[in-house]
């Protein structure tokens, strides 16, 4: 308390959101690919052409999983006059089911399916075409796609490793240190 501290930042490396989760495998990405990092508050989108990230075509949509949670809460109140706990919704989004009345499940599923349809509509706005490219989904929103829509498993890849981003940053940091000759 009352002590001023001064720091010097020696260097900063910046990467597009979601990139670290696929960095160790990006060289395997042949042809056109799209990366969608669907987090709690945003969906970050990046095109990757033959393993090369297209930094000029990165987009952020304020359309994360929390918006789906809010829509479920709203529809549950409108249709059933029920104030549903967000923990129930979170478990439902992760597993595809919940221990609630069937009428409630129908509302929750319908709302989530509409949300997932909107994810794909927004991806198409950024030139996603499943016939021309593969889609790689990272982040918590991948479970929504996995649980609430049909998709071509040969063209859409969902990385549900919750540590993928941290592992990717470790991989990238190691690459950078090695390229600088610091092999510690």
Where are these regions (language model features)?
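Long, charge-rich alpha-helical interaction segments
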Residues: 70, 74-78
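Short beta-strand scaffold segments in enzyme catalytic cores
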Residues: 43-47
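Nucleotide/phosphate-binding catalytic cleft detector across ATP-hydrolyzing
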Residues: 1-33, 52-67, 87-184
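Short, basic interhelical loop/turn and adjoining N-cap
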Residues: 80-83
């Amino acid at each position: 308390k009352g002590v001023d501290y001064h720091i010097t930042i020696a260097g900063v490396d910046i990467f597009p959101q979601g990139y670290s989760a696929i960095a160790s495998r990006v060289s395997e990405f042949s042809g056109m690919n799209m990366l969608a990092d669907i987090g709690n508050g945003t969906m970050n989108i990046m095109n990757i052409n033959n393993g090369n990230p297209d930094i000029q075509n990165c987009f952020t949509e304020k359309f994360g999983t929390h918006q789906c949670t809010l829509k479920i809460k709203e529809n549950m109140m409108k249709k059933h006059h029920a104030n549903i706990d967000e923990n129930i919704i979170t478990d439902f989004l992760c597993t595809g089911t919940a221990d609630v009345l069937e009428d409630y499940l129908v509302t929750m599923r319908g709302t989530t399916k509409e949300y997932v349809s909107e994810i794909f509509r927004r991806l198409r706005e950024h030139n996603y075409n499943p016939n021309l490219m593969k889609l790689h989904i990272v982040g918590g929103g991948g479970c929504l796609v996995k649980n609430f829509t049909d998709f071509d498993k040969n063209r859409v890849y969902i990385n549900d490793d919750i540590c993928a981003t941290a592992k990717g940053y470790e991989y990238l940091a190691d690459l950078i240190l090695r390229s600088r000759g610091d092999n510690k």
